[in-house]
């Protein structure tokens, strides 16, 4: 698979108009897509009207599924641009100076760089963990928040700060405000679990619950900032926030014992990887800076692929700490010039890495906190790396307790130690016994069977496996006995919903199958029913909570083909994210 060739970036961080021997004003940290014209005039000059600003280009909206590649493969590799090769030395020094002179250690610790002995032995490399989960708020986020806030003028800080967040950034801002003696308002979605907003409140901040989503909370926070004179503290897209996160890279280069092959960094909005790259690539350019994203929340990979920032039309919410639809402007500018590519990992792999960390250090990471570890392991396996030093940043440990159920269910699947299978079995005496004999000594961890009126039934089951050959041998035994067997392990639809709905097949006509994301708040179900019932008959409903990001709901609705346009209009008006899965082969196998 070839690396993606990106168009050359226009190099201009500083846009200004000036005349010889006149003062010059420079504005840093604006991309070439948002140029600002500035006229600096002496007293004897007449006023000059700058050209009208160009309207911003509409952002490209894309699906996460439009860019997928094998686990561990280093994709979305940007071509080095002229800006990267001949970038401003002054700009590079600005970030380096900011990082080196930071005051984040007023509040943050220098987190340890620990060897993961069990993982290192299993992979044949020296795997080091940068333990940002050990920070006072169990996340790296306080570094960037504090670095920006401590630099605010005293009069501005006295007015207070505001931010929007459902998690780690909120705690970072709240703790920083407490340290600096200023007020902080934290706007969080109403779907935020009580344990999270109470943790922020306990740090002394004022919590405002607003909106069903982060976007709504952010919009409200920015309005309040404007109306009340508060300073908005962004979660990632600000030079001082980026520099604060960059101290992680500074520490790694100081703590590393021997040359590093790569540093694996979880990517959401891009603040952490931009900061690390801004430092490490200037002092140790040979070290690879590799981003890791969930396969269903790959905004950075897609932005690098298209050569511009894009917006995801949907974003997976399991790793909620990195579940963003759009990366930052400044973070993208730095990342496309300095990072080496992106590794994509599945939810199963993230769960496996949470288990790896528990077995290694007896600590439980949140999904986003285990993301880099999952990417590092997949990368080492894919490229067959041996005897090199790699670092994975364990970025956070604010685990939502409700998600532990999902983690325990999927961890062995992610380790490729468990497989989910379906076998078609004839409805006749003795067939069940024959099936069990063919499974043989393999451990069955889950088994679902329901007698059907049809000539054959579907058995859904999970088995423990030690090698890929063992699984292939089982499938071969089944097929040789005329029992068709399908491996369903990679299907999220099966693992989230269909495995719990084994009550027999249905012959319902005109059934439209959809996966909706319901906000976790009272009244969400009734809002849904008001949109579709009694207009159409609901034929299937399965709810699966995933924590604060919302509930994953599988819905079947009888909608005649000629009424599909009306159905889509009602679904759009409802405002819940959804997509159609009616044509899924596994749904047809198990349910129809």
Swiss-Prot record:
<comment type="similarity">
    <text>Belongs to the serine/threonine dehydratase family.</text>
</comment>
<keyword id="KW-0456">Lyase</keyword>
<feature type="domain" description="ACT-like 1">
    <location>
        <begin position="419"/>
        <end position="490"/>
    </location>
</feature>
<keyword id="KW-0028">Amino-acid biosynthesis</keyword>
<protein>
    <recommendedName>
        <fullName>Threonine dehydratase biosynthetic, chloroplastic</fullName>
        <ecNumber>4.3.1.19</ecNumber>
    </recommendedName>
</protein>
<feature type="transit peptide" description="Chloroplast">
    <location>
        <begin position="1"/>
        <end position="91"/>
    </location>
</feature>
<dbReference type="InterPro" id="IPR005787">
    <property type="entry name" value="Thr_deHydtase_biosynth"/>
</dbReference>
<dbReference type="InterPro" id="IPR038110">
    <property type="entry name" value="TD_ACT-like_sf"/>
</dbReference>
<keyword id="KW-0934">Plastid</keyword>
<keyword id="KW-0100">Branched-chain amino acid biosynthesis</keyword>
<dbReference type="GO" id="GO:0009507">
    <property type="term" value="C:chloroplast"/>
</dbReference>
<keyword id="KW-0809">Transit peptide</keyword>
<dbReference type="GO" id="GO:0004794">
    <property type="term" value="F:threonine deaminase activity"/>
</dbReference>
<dbReference type="InterPro" id="IPR001926">
    <property type="entry name" value="TrpB-like_PALP"/>
</dbReference>
<feature type="domain" description="ACT-like 2">
    <location>
        <begin position="512"/>
        <end position="583"/>
    </location>
</feature>
<dbReference type="InterPro" id="IPR001721">
    <property type="entry name" value="TD_ACT-like"/>
</dbReference>
<feature type="modified residue" description="N6-(pyridoxal phosphate)lysine">
    <location>
        <position position="141"/>
    </location>
</feature>
<dbReference type="Pfam" id="PF00291">
    <property type="entry name" value="PALP"/>
</dbReference>
<dbReference type="InterPro" id="IPR000634">
    <property type="entry name" value="Ser/Thr_deHydtase_PyrdxlP-BS"/>
</dbReference>
<keyword id="KW-0412">Isoleucine biosynthesis</keyword>
<dbReference type="GO" id="GO:0009097">
    <property type="term" value="P:isoleucine biosynthetic process"/>
</dbReference>
<dbReference type="InterPro" id="IPR045865">
    <property type="entry name" value="ACT-like_dom_sf"/>
</dbReference>
<dbReference type="Pfam" id="PF00585">
    <property type="entry name" value="Thr_dehydrat_C"/>
</dbReference>
<keyword id="KW-0150">Chloroplast</keyword>
<keyword id="KW-0663">Pyridoxal phosphate</keyword>
<keyword id="KW-0677">Repeat</keyword>
<dbReference type="InterPro" id="IPR050147">
    <property type="entry name" value="Ser/Thr_Dehydratase"/>
</dbReference>
<comment type="function">
    <text>Catalyzes the formation of alpha-ketobutyrate from threonine in a two-step reaction. The first step is a dehydration of threonine, followed by rehydration and liberation of ammonia.</text>
</comment>
<dbReference type="GO" id="GO:0030170">
    <property type="term" value="F:pyridoxal phosphate binding"/>
</dbReference>
<dbReference type="InterPro" id="IPR036052">
    <property type="entry name" value="TrpB-like_PALP_sf"/>
</dbReference>
<comment type="pathway">
    <text>Amino-acid biosynthesis; L-isoleucine biosynthesis; 2-oxobutanoate from L-threonine: step 1/1.</text>
</comment>
<keyword id="KW-0021">Allosteric enzyme</keyword>
């Amino acid at each position: 698979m070839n690396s993606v060739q990106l168009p050359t970036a226009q190099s201009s961080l500083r846009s200004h108009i000036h005349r010889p021997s006149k003062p010059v004003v420079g504005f840093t940290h604006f991309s070439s897509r948002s140029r600002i014209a500035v006229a600096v005039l002496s007293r004897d000059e007449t006023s000059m009207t700058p050209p009208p600003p160009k309207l911003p280009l509409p952002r490209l909206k894309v699906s996460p599924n439009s860019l997928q590649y094998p686990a561990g493969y280093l994709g979305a590799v940007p071509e080095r641009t002229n800006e990267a090769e001949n970038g401003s030395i002054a700009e590079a020094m600005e970030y380096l100076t900011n990082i080196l002179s930071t005051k984040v250690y007023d509040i943050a610790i220098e987190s340890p760089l620990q060897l993961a002995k069990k993982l290192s032995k299993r992979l044949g490399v020296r795997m080091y963990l940068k333990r940002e989960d050990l920070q006072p708020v169990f996340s790296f986020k306080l570094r960037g928040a504090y670095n920006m806030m401590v630099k605010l003028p005293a009069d501005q800080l006295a007015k207070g700060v505001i931010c929007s967040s459902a998690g780690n950034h909120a705690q970072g801002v709240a703790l920083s405000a407490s340290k600096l003696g200023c007020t902080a308002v934290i706007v969080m979605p109403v779907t935020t679990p009580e344990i999270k907003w109470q943790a922020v409140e306990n740090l002394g901040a004022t919590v405002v619950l607003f909106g069903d989503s982060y976007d709504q909370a952010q919009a409200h926070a920015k309005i309040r900032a404007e109306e009340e004179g508060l300073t908005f503290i962004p979660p990632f897209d600000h030079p001082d926030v980026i520099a604060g996160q960059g101290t992680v890279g500074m520490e790694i280069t100081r703590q590393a014992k021997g040359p590093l092959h790569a540093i694996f960094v979880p990517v959401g909005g891009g603040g952490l990887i931009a900061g690390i790259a801004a430092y490490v690539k200037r002092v140790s350019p040979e070290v690879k800076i590799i981003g890791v994203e969930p396969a269903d929340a790959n905004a950075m990979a897609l932005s690098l692929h298209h050569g511009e920032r894009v917006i995801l039309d949907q974003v997976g919410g399991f790793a909620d700490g990195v579940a963003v639809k759009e990366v930052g402007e400044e973070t993208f500018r730095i990342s496309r010039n300095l990072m080496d590519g992106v590794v994509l990992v599945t939810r199963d792999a993230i769960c496996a890495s949470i288990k790896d960390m528990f077995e290694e250090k007896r600590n439980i990471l949140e999904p986003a906190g285990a993301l880099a570890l999952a990417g590092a392991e997949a990368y080492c396996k894919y490229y067959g790396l041996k005897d090199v030093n790699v670092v994975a940043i364990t970025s956070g440990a604010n685990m939502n307790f409700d998600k532990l159920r999902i983690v325990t269910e999927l961890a062995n699947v992610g380790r490729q130690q468990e497989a989910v299978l379906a076998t078609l079995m004839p409805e006749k005496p003795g067939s069940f016994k024959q099936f069990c004999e063919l499974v043989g000594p393999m451990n069955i961890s889950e088994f679902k069977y329901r007698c059907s009126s049809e000539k054959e039934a579907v058995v859904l089951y999970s088995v423990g496996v030690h090698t890929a050959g063992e699984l292939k041998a089982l499938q071969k035994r089944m097929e040789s006995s005329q029992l068709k067997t399908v491996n369903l392990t990679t299907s999220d639809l099966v693992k989230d919903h269909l495995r719990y709905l084994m009550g027999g097949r249905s012959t319902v006509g005109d059934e439209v199958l959809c996966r909706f994301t319901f906000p976790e708040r009272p009244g969400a179900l009734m809002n849904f029913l008001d949109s579709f019932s009694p207009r159409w008959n609901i034929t299937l409903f399965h709810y699966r909570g995933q924590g604060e990001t919302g509930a994953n709901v599988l819905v079947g609705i009888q909608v005649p083909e000629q009424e599909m346009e009306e159905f889509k209009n009602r679904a759009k008006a409802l405002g819940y994210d959804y997509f159609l899965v009616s044509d899924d082969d596994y749904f047809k196998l198990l349910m129809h």
